[in-house]
A protein has these predicted regions:
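Alpha-helical substrate-recognition element adjacent to the catalytic core
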Residues: 1-125
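C-terminal cap/substrate-recognition subdomain and adjoining C-terminal extension
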Residues: 86-231
Length: 231
C-alpha cells in the first residue's frame, strides 16, 4: 500500500550541514556498545531512552541559525544526518525519540545488525567512515559540523575525515562522557583522552564539552553558532 515519507533535497546553494552520532551523543545509552546495538535491535521502548541534556537545543540552534544565510528553503533548516552503528529496523523508534525530545528532523545513516560476508559482526567504525566519505562525494559543496562523543571512536573517525576532506568539515564538537558512562563503555573510570583531535587541521575548529549546553557555550565563545571558520 502507498506510504508517505518526508524528502529533504539538499540544493547546490546550501553549504552547511550537521552530522551527529546517536548513542551517548543525543541519547544516553549507559551500556557497552555491542550490548547497546543488541538492545536497539530487539527492544522498542522509546520511553526508556533519555536525552543528553542540551543536545536538542544545540542541534536545533546549529541547523536554524545558519539557514537564512546558507540558501536553505523557507520553512526548513540546514540538513542534519544522524549517523549510527545501530540497525535500520530501529529507525522508527529512534525517530520517535528524537521528535519527542525536540531534536531537528533529519536523515539516518544506519547499518545492518548481524553477520556480514567478512565476519560475524560488522565494523561500526568502518560504517561511519564509509558514510562520511559518501556524504563528501554526494555533497561536495556542503561543509559538515561533526558531532559525537569520546566514548568510542568518534574523535578518531572525525579527525581522519577532517584530514582527508578538510574542505568538507566546518568543525568538530565532541561530548565528553561522565565517569560512569566511561566505565560502562571502557570498564574504567578514567576519561579517554582523544589524542586524535590534535591531528585535526588547524583551520578546523574543535570543541569539547560535557553536554549540549557546554558545547553551545564553547561554540558561541568563538563568535558563531552557525557555519564555523577558523580555530
Amino acid at each position: 500500500r502507498p506510504t508517505c515519507v518526508r524528502v529533504r533535497i539538499v540544493s547546490d546553494r546550501e553549504h552547511f550541514g550537521v552530522v551527529s552520532d546517536i548513542d551517548d551523543t543525543v541519547m544516553v545509552s549507559m551500556l557497552p556498545r555491542l550490548v547497546t546495538a543488541a538492545k536497539h535491535a530487539f527492544l522498542d521502548r522509546v520511553s526508556s531512552r533519555e536525552a543528553v541534556p542540551g543536545m536538542a537545543n544545540l542541534l536545533t540552534t546549529l541547523t536554524t541559525s545558519s539557514a537564512s544565510s546558507e540558501g536553505v528553503p523557507a520553512g526548513t533548516h540546514s540538513p542534519i544526518m544522524y549517523l549510527s552503528t545501530g540497525a535500520w529496523n530501529v529507525v522508527p523508534t529512534v525517530r520517535s525519540f528524537l521528535e519527542r525530545s525536540g531534536y531537528p528532523a533529519g536523515g539516518f545513516l544506519m547499518t545492518d545488525f548481524g553477520p556480514s560476508n567478512t565476519g560475524w559482526f560488522r565494523s561500526g567504525p568502518e560504517h561511519k567512515r564509509r558514510e562520511l566519505r559518501r556524504l563528501a562525494r554526494m555533497f561536495p559543496h556542503v561543509r559538515w559540523l561533526l558531532v559525537g562523543d569520546d566514548g568510542q571512536h568518534d574523535p578518531e573517525i572525525y579527525a581522519e575525515f577532517a584530514r582527508e576532506f578538510p574542505q568538507c568539515v566546518a568543525g568538530i564538537a565532541i561530548r565528553s562522557l561522565s565517569e560512569i558512562e566511561q566505565f560502562m563503555a571502557h570498564g574504567s573510570f578514567e576519561a579517554m583522552v582523544p589524542d586524535a583531535l590534535w591531528t585535526v587541521p588547524e583551520s578546523i575548529p574543535v570543541w569539547y564539552g560535557s553536554d549540549g549546553e557546554a558545547l553551545l557555550e564553547n561554540i558561541r565563545g568563538r563568535g558563531t553558532a552557525g557555519p564555523l571558520t577558523g580555530r
